[in-house]
UniProtKB/Swiss-Prot annotation:
This protein's UniProt keywords: Antiport, Cell inner membrane, Cell membrane, Ion transport, Membrane, Sodium, Sodium transport, Transmembrane, Transmembrane helix, Transport
Family recorded in the similarity comment: Belongs to the NhaB Na(+)/H(+) (TC 2.A.34) antiporter family.
Membrane topology of the entry: Multi-pass membrane protein
TM annotation in the entry: 23-43, 63-83, 97-117, 120-140, 144-164, 202-222, 238-258, 303-323, 357-377, 391-411, 447-467, 475-495
Alphabetized HAMAP family for the sequence: NhaB
Keyword Cell inner membrane appears in the UniProt entry: yes
Native species: Salmonella dublin (strain CT_02021853)
Highest taxon, organism lineage: Bacteria
Signal peptide: none
UniProt protein name: Na(+)/H(+) antiporter NhaB
Length: 514
């Protein structure tokens, strides 16, 4: 018997999301207009809380859908206007270009990145050195490339290697289902569990590495570019201003990587089983023999384009998104990717998040129009200038650990800049606050997958169920990094940021917003 029209519509609404989630969103949409009529300020905060809820529940439904419905309703009932949303989007065009073109550009360099991580995995036998190498490589790449893409590449390597060994262990060849362990004998299962633990630890080290590197440069994370634009900083300025906090944090993060591997704490310390290494080495040897001269030329071309990318970013030869577009053009033209559909695949990772970011800007428009953060900012600005840095860092860190850090960073930098323009804080203090906001947004957000887009991408990837990486396990394995990064970042904001910035300014290293 066919279901009723109402039931059919209910099933279509937000698809496979749980019924309680659908019901919660409907309640939000129904009550918001009435609360807005009664008290716009409370309604505005309720909208922000609802939007953060959709971000926290990203595994139930991609936030673009529920968040977009809330944003559309907010415009319709007058919490903000379509014109203001357009202004916010226009003001952040560089960030949208970054997501559209830079992420797509790096897609065409995946072969080179796969080659790098494969060589690391098979060349280094010490697990501690290998973990450190993955963390450093991910940090370096994330300083210039998109963290999502770096994690996507490491996932590709891990899935590929897992599949190779799983086929051998199950003796099922190409028909093998990687999620099915029923055909694997007990001996192989023990080795497979050890291999899973090994891959889990490598993925977490690489994921944290993207956060360590991503905080250091203006292109490492989308919110960095928003903050850099608000402060008027270019690539070199941004790196130098962040360095009093980010360099000590990087060093301590790498020491944490070595410590948890050495002590086998928090689920780390598993080594690559020799039987697995033999299988993977044999497969890699066969792949290298099959590599043609044309394939080798592609790797060389991608390496040269990588040099161009780093140089163009460092010298600020063009807007970040346009540099990304140049990477797309050069990489496709010189490696022979000419089919429209093949090029289109490069944009599938970035466009959903680009659309979600546009919804963020709608919520930011509501926050500005309803003056939602005015009480918080007034509270912070009443403190001493020294205490303001700590408070901004902590408020950003708390919100970023449960919500998306792009959203949080955008809100706070807008409020800090408004305070400067209104004369509430000096230019010098604003520039220090921008560093506190950026580091507070990036570092504590490793606590949960909700804060870091790269972590969320890993959790929702095809790899997570294969290596038994659940939400809880990810939070547990991230805990030592969360504690170290947050505390060292806080201490640096408190004690080293102001004197180091003053010294660099006097030395003539830093440009100042005019």
């Amino acid at each position: 018997m066919e279901i009723s029209w109402g039931r059919a519509m209910w099933r279509n609404f937000l698809g496979q999301s749980p019924d309680w989630y659908k019901l919660a969103l409907l309640v939000f949409l129904i009550v918001n207009p009435f609360i807005f009529l009664a008290n716009p300020f409370i309604a505005g905060w309720l909208l922000v809380a609802e939007f953060i809820f959709t971000l926290a529940m990203a595994l139930k439904c991609y936030p673009l859908l529920p968040g977009g419905l809330l944003a559309i309703e907010a415009v319709i009932i007058g919490m903000t206007s379509a014109a203001h949303v357009r202004e916010e989007v226009a003001a952040n065009l560089e960030v949208l270009l970054l997501l559209m073109f830079m992420v797509a550009g790096i897609y065409f360099m995946k072969q080179l990145l796969l080659f790098i991580f494969t060589r690391l995995l098979l060349s280094i036998r010490s697990k501690m050195v290998l973990s450190l190498a993955f963390c450093v490589a991910a940090a370096f790449l994330s300083a210039f490339l998109d963290a999502l893409t770096v994690v996507a590449v490491v996932i590709s390597v891990a899935v590929g290697f897992y599949g190779i060994y799983h086929r051998v262990a199950s003796s099922r060849g190409e028909e093998n289902d990687m999620l099915d362990d029923s055909h694997i004998d007990p001996h192989y299962k023990t080795v497979l569990e050890q291999f899973r633990g090994f891959l889990r630890s490598l993925m977490m080290h690489a994921g944290v590495g993207t956060a360590l590197g991503g905080v250091m440069t203006m292109v490492g994370e989308p919110q960095n570019l928003i903050i850099a634009k608000a402060a008027g900083w270019h690539f070199g300025d941004f790196f130098l201003r962040m360095s009093p906090v980010t360099v000590p944090v990087l060093v301590c993060g790498l020491l944490t990587c070595m410590l948890v591997e050495k002590m086998r704490w928090f689920g780390y310390g598993e080594t690559l089983p020799e039987k697995v290494r033999d299988v993977l080495q044999q497969f890699d040897d066969q792949s290298r023999k099959k590599r043609t001269r044309q394939d080798k030329i592609k790797l060389i071309v991608q390496a040269v384009i990588g040099v161009w990318l780093v140089t163009a970013l460092a010298l600020h030869l063009a807007e970040v998104g346009l540099i990304g577009l140049s990477v797309i053009i050069l990489a496709t033209a010189l490696t022979g990717v000419t089919d429209e559909h093949a090029i289109g695949k490069a944009f599938t990772e970035s466009l959903p998040f680009t659309a979600l970011l546009t919804v963020f800007f709608s919520i930011v428009a509501v926050i500005i129009d309803q003056h939602l953060f005015a009480p918080i900012i007034q509270f912070v600005l009443q403190a001493s200038e020294h205490a303001q840095l700590t408070l901004f860092y902590l408020f950003n860190g708390l919100l970023s650990s449960i919500s998306d850090n792009v959203f949080v960073g955008t809100i706070y930098i807008n409020e800090a800049k408004a305070a400067m323009e209104n004369g509430a804080i000096s230019l010098k203090q604003f520039e220090l606050l921008a560093v506190a906001i950026n580091t507070g947004t990036n570092l504590p957000s490793v606590a949960t997958p909700n804060g870091q887009a790269a972590f969320l991408f890993l959790l929702t990837s095809a790899l997570a169920p294969l290596i038994r990486l659940s939400y809880g396990r990810m939070v547990w394995m991230a805990l030592p990094y969360t504690i170290v990064l947050t505390l060292i970042g806080l201490l640096c904001v408190e004690f080293t940021l102001a004197p180091a910035t003053e010294w660099m300014t006097q030395a003539g290293w830093l440009a100042t917003l005019s």
